[in-house]
Amino acid sequence: MLVIPAVDMKNKKCVQLIQGNPDKKHVELDNPPEIAKKWVSEGAEMLHLVDLDGALDGKRVNDEFIEEIIKTSGVPVQIGGGIRSIEDAVYLVEKGAKKVIIGTIAVEKPEIIKELSENIGSEKIMVSLDAKDGKVVIKGWKEKTKYTPVEIGKILEEMGAGSILFTNVDSEGLLNGINIEPTKELVENLKIPIVASGGVTTIDDLLKFKEIGVYGVVVGSAIYKNMINLKDAIEAVK
């Protein structure tokens, strides 16, 4: 199982938000490319980049850093935040992204995933599903849909999604542990790899995810606040 450090960018800084709220930050650091290099030096085999300006405002202002991280980190990079069109996704793949993470638009128009998979190949498409109170939420967690994660997950798998990034919003950024059940349901009901995110605070949390068969876990606040040592975490889940 992969332990995948998050490098979330807002206003050209590396940040960690509390429950996705742009006004509530745990962490704010300069020079995201340097942070990315630090995680790779500690053993990260993949990086998770999020353009929060893109996600929240639909404007991509961190492209320069994203390109630098892809070029200099030496590991595969999955990228999300503000990818609202096929053109956006193709642009990032051409720049060298291993996977592009598609959120809101995939839930609103699942057929776009079919079109995208024909353009860039399904292995490059990761769909981000965020759930709150058992339902998928979109538009930066502001709007609740009628779908459960498994319902929309099955549709997206059929359309050609290559993997799912699943965030349990109820746990995200609160640093008080995880609820494993929603992720477990996805792993049991879908064939494509699931990467989990949200609420990891201990190596024990990571081991619980490993036990249910996820492909990887994105870690954010816990490594930035030194609650988890990344090297130890990677070693523990090998």
Curated annotation (Swiss-Prot):
It catalyses: 1-(5-phospho-beta-D-ribosyl)-5-[(5-phospho-beta-D-ribosylamino)methylideneamino]imidazole-4-carboxamide = 5-[(5-phospho-1-deoxy-D-ribulos-1-ylimino)methylamino]-1-(5-phospho-beta-D-ribosyl)imidazole-4-carboxamide. Its EC number is 5.3.1.16. Pathway: Amino-acid biosynthesis; L-histidine biosynthesis; L-histidine from 5-phospho-alpha-D-ribose 1-diphosphate: step 4/9. One of its GO terms (cellular component) is cytoplasm. The keyword Cytoplasm applies. Its main location: cytoplasm. Keywords: Amino-acid biosynthesis, Cytoplasm, Histidine biosynthesis, Isomerase. The active site is at D8, D130. It is found in: Cytoplasm. Belongs to the HisA/HisF family. This is 1-(5-phosphoribosyl)-5-[(5-phosphoribosylamino)methylideneamino] imidazole-4-carboxamide isomerase.
